[in-house]
Amino acid sequence: AKVSRKPREPRTAVTQSTRRIKRKKTLSKPRSRGGVKAPKTTMKIKRALRRNLRRKIQTSAGQPKKAKKARKHFVSYYVLKKSGQNKKTNQNKRQNQNKRQNQNKRRGQPVPEQEIMEKPTTSCKWCSQGVTRRGRRY
């Protein structure tokens, strides 16, 4: 069986503090209703330091800046330049052709003339016809 004890009463009398009237806090900034931010009333002016200004003037006078080029639409053209690998293969083809011609001359056979024509690597309709986009033949 549980026995509940009475809480001990303090021997000294406790004086109850009188209630103070709570005052509403005074806000430093007026709050706007509706969650909209109020525009700032003060503006800060940024000032450059004097020595920095002098440096900037000296550097800008010595080296004028280049004008930036405006961006243009990206258009891809078929590149007619040969890469280093293509040049090597062409040299090998020519060497082989020269060897054949020399062998045929030694045998006394007529030399068949062949033109070396590179096939375009892309499936572009202009490239397969041997015409660039600007209408020039190569």
Swiss-Prot record:
InterPro entries: Spermatid_TP (IPR040433). It comes from the Eukaryota. It is found in: Nucleus; Chromosome. Its main location: nucleus. Residues 120-131 have a biased composition (Polar residues). Residues 86-101 have a biased composition (Low complexity). Residues 1-138 are annotated as: Disordered. One of its GO terms (molecular function) is DNA binding. The modification Phosphoserine is found at residue 4. Residues 1-11 have a biased composition (Basic and acidic residues). The N-terminal half is highly basic. This is Spermatid nuclear transition protein 4. It comes from Sus scrofa (Pig).
